[in-house]
Amino acid sequence: MAAVKELIRTEENQTLSFGDYELDQKAKLSDYPFEGDMYKVKTYKDITKLERNGMFVYESVPGTAVMNLTQDDTGMTFSVEGPEDAQITVEMEADTEYEIFLNGASTGKVKTNLGGKLSFSAELENADVVAVKIEKC
């Protein structure tokens, strides 16, 4: 896995990959069509952010590369990599409890706020890739 040089792309398995944490200058790509929605990505070494139809989906500080992102009514899955540990925030259903799994191990349950934001840390510095699964309880 590596940075997504084209900033965002659709994978053969109909998932999204995005983010290039190797960039020194901010880059963005808007109006990327995927499954009837329009996506926008902003990414560089300090932050990676994804929006769907103008609404928040994902943000990491510092920047990361995300592969095979899928989201449905029950949760979200993706793989993430970056040069150092990252704080990741995703948009889920508001005021709902989710369990977060990193590389198959539960990190516990977290309840989203009224805006639906869910935040967690991922230890990326000494890892090749971290598999993330967020599951509705």
Predicted regions and their residues:
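Hydrophobic residues positioned within well-ordered beta-strands of beta-sheet architectures
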Residues: 76-78, 100, 132
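Short strand-turn-strand beta-turns centered on an Asx-Gly dipeptide
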Residues: 101-105
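Short, solvent-exposed mixed-charge patches
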Residues: 1-2, 137
